């Protein structure tokens, strides 16, 4: 039996990952999971959230396992914002093999800094404090960009211009999945 696909959406804070992951559900089926949203729901009072810190891999991986264990084995999974660091990528690769899944495509929603700042000024999420925003941007540049480059080297990365309207970005995703 062929393995079920995993799709990944990565991008900096405010790049539209969650919306596009939900849109991707309509194209490939399956279920999307915003790991950041799940973490915020479970740890809303945790001071690490207000500081924009990454949680230890063990905590994040535990949330991922708990979340996906109910997904039927033949159904695609769409991760939004995960894996964020190299160790999480390695864990997901190994976990995928154990679960009979494979990374089919990784979409990098590339958004310019000015556009990110504009979007964040409109978003108004409780954990979007100036300090937390800067910390998450640093983590993206220092930790997530190398993950993106690893997926590029593996031949599964699709770079999407995330500066466009949500509808245009969705269309680019649809076209990329269908090719």
Regions found by a protein language model. Give the residues of each.
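Glycine-rich phosphate-binding loop of ATP-dependent small-molecule kinases
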Residues: 1-179
């Amino acid at each position: 039996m062929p393995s079920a696909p995993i799709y990944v959406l990565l991008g900096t804070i405010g790049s539209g990952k969650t919306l596009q992951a939900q849109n991707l559900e309509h194209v490939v089926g399956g279920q999307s999971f915003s790991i950041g949203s799940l973490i915020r729901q479970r740890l809303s009072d945790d001071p690490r959230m207000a500081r924009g810190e990454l949680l230890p891999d063990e905590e994040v991986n535990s949330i991922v396992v708990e979340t996906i264990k109910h997904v039927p084995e033949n159904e695609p999974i769409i991760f939004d914002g995960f894996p964020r660091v190299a160790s999480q990528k390695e864990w997901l690769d190994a976990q995928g093999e154990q679960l009979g899944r494979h990374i089919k495509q990784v979409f990098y929603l590339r958004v310019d800094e000015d556009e990110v700042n504009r979007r964040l000024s409109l978003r108004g999420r409780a954990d979007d404090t100036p300090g937390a925003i800067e910390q998450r941007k640093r983590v993206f540049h220092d930790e997530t960009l190398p993950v993106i480059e690893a997926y590029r080297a593996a031949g599964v990365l699709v770079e999407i211009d995330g500066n466009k309207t949500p509808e245009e970005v969705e269309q680019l995703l649809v076209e990329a999945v269908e090719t």
